[in-house]
């Protein structure tokens, strides 16, 4: 796998998080009854960053949790290994809330579909929105993001790699081939 280009550096990621945070506040006319749910693994630190940014802007803390979709995947029988379940952490109720699912990359839509199933098993939200750092296209399901940090048209053989300080020690988005 060869790195073709860096698409976003630390500053570009920070700007995208700030913009997404403002868009979430504007679209929802504030943050009342709003919760953020990061999809493990890299959606979690992105959700936490959005939460901190919203708190800076609005002066209100937004409940933030994370969800593990391992057992909701539709490809478990294809991977032929025992799934490693990392656990879901939501210390709040999602009933009648606006849930913003947060992930790093939107590709086929299958991760988001599994996340929707997991959220609906937990409760009945008023609505579910989707925020992603990168949308690379190639959807296999009728799913679209409400908030996008960067749209990056790719070919199917290219890979978008997101590195985050909290997990990888640096912030960057690169495209590899």
From Swiss-Prot:
Q: Report the InterPro entries cross-referenced here.
A: PRibTrfase_dom, PRTase-like, PyrR, PyrR_bifunctional
Provide this UniProt record's keywords sorted from A to Z: Glycosyltransferase, RNA-binding, Transcription, Transcription regulation, Transcription termination, Transferase
One GO molecular-function entry: RNA binding
Q: Name one Pfam family in it.
A: Pribosyltran
List the GO biological process terms: DNA-templated transcription termination
Q: What catalytic activity is recorded?
A: UMP + diphosphate = 5-phospho-alpha-D-ribose 1-diphosphate + uracil
Query: What EC number(s) does its UniProt record assign?
Result: 2.4.2.9
UniProt short sequence motif PRPP-binding, positions renumbered to this chain: 99-111
What does this gene product do? Regulates transcriptional attenuation of the pyrimidine nucleotide (pyr) operon by binding in a uridine-dependent manner to specific sites on pyr mRNA. This disrupts an antiterminator hairpin in the RNA and favors formation of a downstream transcription terminator, leading to a reduced expression of downstream genes. Also displays a weak uracil phosphoribosyltransferase activity which is not physiologically significant.
Q: Which family does it belong to?
A: Belongs to the purine/pyrimidine phosphoribosyltransferase family. PyrR subfamily.
On subunit structure and binding partners, the annotation says:
Homodimer and homohexamer; in equilibrium.
Q: Which HAMAP family does the protein's record reference?
A: PyrR
Under NCBIfam families, the record lists: PRK05205.1-1, PRK05205.1-3, PRK05205.1-4, PRK05205.1-5
Q: What is this protein called?
A: Bifunctional protein PyrR
Organism encoding this protein: Clostridioides difficile (strain 630) (Peptoclostridium difficile)
Query: Which gene is transcribed and translated to give this protein?
Result: pyrR
């Amino acid at each position: 796998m060869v790195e073709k280009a860096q698409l976003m550096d630390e500053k570009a990621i920070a700007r995208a998080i700030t913009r997404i945070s403002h868009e979430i506040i504007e679209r929802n006319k504030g943050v009342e009854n709003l919760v953020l749910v990061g999809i493990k693994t890299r959606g979690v630190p992105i959700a936490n960053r959005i939460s901190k940014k919203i708190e800076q802007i609005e002066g209100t803390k937004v409940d933030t949790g994370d969800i593990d979709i391992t057992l909701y995947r539709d490809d478990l029988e294809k991977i032929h290994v025992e799934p490693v379940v990392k656990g879901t952490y939501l210390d709040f109720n999602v009933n009648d809330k606006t849930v913003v699912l947060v992930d790093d990359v939107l590709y086929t839509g299958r991760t988001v579909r599994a996340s929707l199933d997991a959220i609906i098993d937990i409760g009945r939200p008023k609505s579910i929105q989707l925020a992603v750092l990168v949308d690379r296209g190639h959807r296999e399901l009728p799913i679209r993001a409400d908030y996008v940090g960067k749209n990056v048209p790719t070919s199917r053989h290219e890979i978008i790699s997101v590195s985050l300080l909290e997990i990888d020690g640096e912030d960057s988005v690169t495209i590899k081939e």
